[in-house]
């Protein structure tokens, strides 16, 4: 008896759309693969930069510089960073307006405390997505404000140690 079969090889391509989807699930913002600069709609209108031709990166709000760099990220302050030949200048982490961009699909900062968000608890030390989108807000702070990204509920977020 002759048996015939076919094999289908499935593969995924690392492109902007694929990366942006994963990044969005994690509550981050993904730079386009082909864009040198991506402009956020802040009132002060600063640019967030990515090096041309590099894979997409996912950016998260407010991280410590050492933790960001240790995990392969790049820190910058949206008030002072600017685009120069597609590279970040005057960059740094550690303040209210800081972001950390990482080329992988993991949050760069290993949170050591548990966070409460809309009455639910999350293990903040998790290293895979989906993540608690409340982490987009400033750590250790309780306030009401419009979120940094449109896919995050504009609700009060409280962090407790």
From Swiss-Prot:
Secretion signal: which residues? 1-19
- Asked whether the UniProt record includes Signal among its keywords, one would answer yes
For this UniProt record, the keywords arranged alphabetically read as follows: Secreted, Signal
Signal listed as a keyword:
yes
User: As annotated in Swiss-Prot or TrEMBL, what is the tissue specificity of this protein?
Assistant: Component of the acid-insoluble organic matrix of calcified layers of the shell (at protein level).
Q: Where in the cell is it found?
A: Secreted
Q: Which domain of life is it from?
A: Eukaryota
Q: What is this protein called?
A: Uncharacterized shell protein 4
Q: Which GO terms describe its cellular component?
A: extracellular region
């Amino acid at each position: 008896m002759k048996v015939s079969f076919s094999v289908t090889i499935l593969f995924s391509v690392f492109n902007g759309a694929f990366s942006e989807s994963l990044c969005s699930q994690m509550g981050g913002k993904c730079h386009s693969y082909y864009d040198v600069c991506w402009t956020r709609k802040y009132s002060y209108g600063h640019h967030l930069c990515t090096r041309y031709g590099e894979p997409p990166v996912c950016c998260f709000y407010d991280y410590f510089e050492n933790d960001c760099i240790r995990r392969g990220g790049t820190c910058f302050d949206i008030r002072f960073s600017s685009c120069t030949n597609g590279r970040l200048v005057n960059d740094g982490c550690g303040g209210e307006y800081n972001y950390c961009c990482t080329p992988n699909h993991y949050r760069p900062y290993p949170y050591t405390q548990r966070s409460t968000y809309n009455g639910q608890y999350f293990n903040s030390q998790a290293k895979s997505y989906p993540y608690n989108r409340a982490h987009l807000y400033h750590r250790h702070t309780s306030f009401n404000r419009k979120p940094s990204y449109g896919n995050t509920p504009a609700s009060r977020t409280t962090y407790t140690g």
